[in-house]
Amino acid sequence: LTAKLGYPITDDLDIYTRLGGMVWRADTKAHNNVTGESEKNHDTGVSPVFAGGVEWAITPEIATRLEYQWTNNIGDANTIGTRPDNGLLSLGVSYRFGQGEAAPVVAPAPAPAPEVQTKHFTLKSDVLFNFNKATLKPEGQAALDQLYSQLSNLDPKDGSVVVLGYTDRIGSDAYNQGLSERRAQSVVDYLISKGIPADKISARGMGESNPVTGNTCDNVKQRAALIDCLAPDRRVEIEVKGI
């Protein structure tokens, strides 16, 4: 019984040593010329075993080795008449079971990128502002307070807010563009004062683009009635993008 200790020289070549012991039994038979009888003796014992060699892996399963083994003091000179040492030089082939190619390691699939969700809120400009004005009314501030309570869960590291201001078609394009920008900025300034990070919110004026009334007010001529008819176009839309 021996223990094998190996050291790799290359991927395919190892040197090794084996250390242990061997249980042996030695038998002798001698002929007595005087009596004409044969004498038989035997002895048993344990002797140390030392071995060293090189092993070359031809394949993962098959290897060849060259080894020298030495066993010390086999037998008892008083019992069997001799106590030799034993040396053995051997060349052999070994087969290792279960050494097939390892299954390729499959890297885990990367986690999917977090889905960016966009939420939309629409506020009536007539609630936020007086007609043709960009200063928030008390009712408008109350409406934004309610909106902020919904936005307060937004993580500023992972989201952004865009405020879009819209006007109706009454007035020139340039005037309406400027009014929509001022109204959007008023909403942004108020939400920043409530706690939305300034670098996570922006204002954009859309002028009289994208009217929601379509052509439903084309036949309305009286100004007051037209203002009422176009009220849905006067709005502030808020886009919240967050993960």
Swiss-Prot record:
- What is its membrane topology? Multi-pass membrane protein
User: Region (4 X 2 AA tandem repeats of A-P) spans which residues?
Assistant: 107-114
Q: Tell me which CDD domains the record gives.
A: OmpA_C-like
Any one Gene Ontology molecular-function term assigned to this protein's record: porin activity
**Could you tell me what this protein is called?**
Outer membrane protein A
Q: NCBIfam families, alphabetically? A: PRK10808.1 (NF008071)
Signal peptide start-end: none
